[in-house]
Amino acid sequence: VYFFFIKKHKWYSIKVPVIALGGLLLMTLLKQLFNRPRPLIPLLEPVKGLSFPSGHAMMSVTFYGLLILLVWEYITNRFWKWLLTSLLVILILLIGFSRIYLRLHYFSDVMAGFAAGIIWLSLCVWIIGRMERFSKKEIDPAMAKDTDVV
C-alpha cells in the first residue's frame, strides 16, 4: 500500500506481496514434500508441524533480504547502507540459529531454509525486474535498453 499510494511504485506494490505469499506457499509445499519430523526433545515446548526446511529461516531471508534490497536501492549514505545491511544480516542469522538452539530444527533445516529463501528472493526479483523493464519498454522505449529484455 505504501509503495502504491505514497511512493507511486507499482512494481514494489506487486513485489512485496508476491514474494511474501509465494514464499509461504513454497515453504508449505517443501515441508509437505520432505515430510521431515521435528527434533524429538525441544528446549521449551513442543511445536506442531514439519521440520524441513525451516520456515523461520526461509521467511527471514525472504523478508529481510527484500529489505536489504530496498536499503541498497533507496539509501544513498554509505554508512547507513552498510550499517542497516549488517544489522539485517545479523537478524537473519540470529533467527535461523535460534531455531537450532531451541531444538525446533536441525542445522540442515535452517541451512535449507536460508538457501530456499535466497533462491526464492533472487528468482522473484529477477522475474519481476524483467517484467518491470519490459513494461517500461512498451510504454516508453527510451526508458528501457534494448538489451534488457530478450
Please place each PLM-identified region on the residue numbering.
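Hydrophobic alpha-helical bundle signature of multipass membrane enzymes
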Residues: V1-L50, L66-E73, W82-L84
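Membrane-embedded catalytic cores of phosphoryl/pyrophosphoryl-handling enzymes
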Residues: L40-V150
